[in-house]
Amino acid sequence: MVSSDWPIIMCGDFSEKFFMDGTKEVKHRREFGHQGGELSEQGARGTVAGLYSEIRDTMGLSMVNLIYRRMATEEGVLEWVWAWINGAINSLDIEDELAQLSDGVAWPAVKSVQRASLPLLGIDEVEEIKLASVLSQYNRGNSLNLLLLNAFLSQLKKRKVLQGPRMQPLKARRVHVKELPPILDLGQMGQDTAAVVRVLAKYVSPPGSLMIPSLFRHLAHWPGFLALVAPHILQSIANGEVRKVSSCLKERAVSKVSALRLQTTDIITEKVPSIDIRDYWAEEIDSYLQKPIPEMIVIGNMIESILPDEEK
């Protein structure tokens, strides 16, 4: 199976009235999503657009992670998974859980660049703020998903597909979340930058498939910086550091999930997908949890450490 992270581009005039028809919205999701594809944030309408907005607000992010954009291509899957995740995130002290997940982790060591060098990479003060925000949000999002999706699979394996954490009032995660620049398609990048993105993606994709992590596509906005960090990423992958640290994160996440005390209720969603669809997405989620999600946490934090310290 080939999993593409390329955005789904929508054309034509799509009115709100069109998407009030549930049948037409399902058709839309099937047309603009396919097995291995995604439904982009720009292409989302109706129910999916509402879910994306709720995901961003609840998780304290300005973007929707790839795994959820993938789920949105299959009718009912994102609704089903997010109903459980939304309940979980609101029944936990999630900020404390996140802090414990990364507490004391030794990220692969990389020397930070001097602030005076950033203009040589095409990064001024404004762009540095944007870049730092991209990195911090991906590190947060991937860490949340490592915890919450592991918890979801744990409950699914116990056949608690109709059970989930009791829904709590929505909690504001941040007072303000900076808007991120758009995710770039490979065709919107320079040829050399697209080649770098493809190479990096090759080493973090799940076994037997190809996906392009959205972080790399976001970093393509700063091709000079991406070219600078790419060798460090590849070296840390080659020497086993990324695998070692990501394995530690996976073990911590699984251990924390087993200790979580989630309040449950009987029904959290009106419709649960068929067993075949549940099995497919359980495997898909697990493949992301085994490699790209934990490895991108390591890579994201490593890249973040390259940015200048406040005093530099």
Kindly give the residue locations of the regions a language model identified.
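Hydrophobic alpha-helical segments
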Residues: 1, 6-312
